[in-house]
Amino acid sequence: MKNRFNGKVVWVTGASSGIGEALVCNFMKRGSTVIASSNEPAELDRVLKNCVGLPGKMICAPFDLSDTSGIEQIADEQVATTGGIDYLINLGGISQRAAIVDTPLWLDRKIMEINYFGTIALTKAVLPHMIRQKSGHILATSSISGRFGFPLRSAYSASKQAIHGFFETLHLENKKNNIRASVIIPGRVRTKISLRALDAQGREHGKMDAGQEAGITPEKAADQIIRGIIRNNREILVGSGELIMLYIRRYLPWLFFRIADRIRST
């Protein structure tokens, strides 16, 4: 089977751990040049050392999604360095574990700033370059909680639902430019997302949710994402049995609300 990623340039945010790290290694095995971004430079260096010997190339480009002021310059620099971006995979983000009544507005804004505005800022910075090269594929990460509300995740769910609206519009506006847009919808994946989720004081939750612990590995999630890219899927579902909640919410909403009322971990 032809390797469509050999020699391609792939930009991955959230690349210092979890699904992002697994994607970096997967694409490098396929011969891609991977721009790896995160707000943790030391962890990016660790990923780079772990990928030594793979046929692809990794470029470390650390930045913080919560500070959008310099993103356009970073994008211009990476395009100049690599000659162009073929795939942009927005994985960086933050989750939440706090009830609405306990969550201050500044925390809602912070989560939205990282998950939504940070993602679209990088997307808008890369898009003109893709339009000029008349090709590209931009992906953003939502969540199954981006398809429905869920307890203790109000701002997180809202930020992920906003991603769907933006990227559906991105796809419709740029199909004529030969640019695709897709949304990745993860369920339970064994990453640090619940450990790093923010509580009502903006501190790390520090606990691994039982559902997260039982989830698929980041490596399997990366395989599912790449398979979805190859198939040109508009929505790429990542996970296993928990994804049935998407269908229950759509076709049996009464059952969904009964189940969601009892579940506190995803």
Language model segments and positions:
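Substrate-binding pocket helix/loop in short-chain dehydrogenase/reductase
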Residues: A99-I100, L107-R109
